[in-house]
């Protein structure tokens, strides 16, 4: 079984670890679908890392490279990057697409993840 990284840090998720780290999580999980070639994806990376530190005891903030993990990307219909999906108890409960300011990302964590 895959091991989670330390609380408060970004978790890397793959097609192989998605079920264990996202769907089976007892905490809400925000998954950032991103790609190396995507400038807006890189623009939100620092904010996501900071929010992982801020909310890490209550939620998991994860990153999934869409190019390297096409199964999860297809399964959830991700067509644009970055896409953030919020999961609770294995179900998608919220989403946002595109680069957003840190205040918007924080709002997603507090409202859609119900923190």
Report the location of each language-model feature.
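Proteins that catalyze or organize thiol-disulfide redox chemistry
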Residues: 1-30, 35-60, 67-71, 75-83, ...
């Amino acid at each position: 079984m895959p091991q989670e990284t330390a609380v408060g840090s970004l978790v890397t998720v793959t097609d192989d670890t998605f079920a264990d780290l996202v769907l089976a999580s007892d905490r809400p999980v925000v998954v950032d679908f991103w790609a190396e070639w995507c400038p807006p994806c890189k623009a939100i990376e620092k904010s996501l890392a900071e929010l992982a530190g801020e909310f890490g005891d209550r939620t998991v903030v994860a990153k999934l490279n869409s190019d390297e993990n096409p199964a999860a990307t297809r399964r959830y219909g991700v067509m644009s990057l970055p896409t953030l999906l919020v999961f609770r108890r294995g179900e998608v409960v919220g989403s946002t697409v595109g680069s957003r300011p840190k205040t918007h990302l924080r709002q997603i964590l507090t409202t859609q993840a119900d923190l």
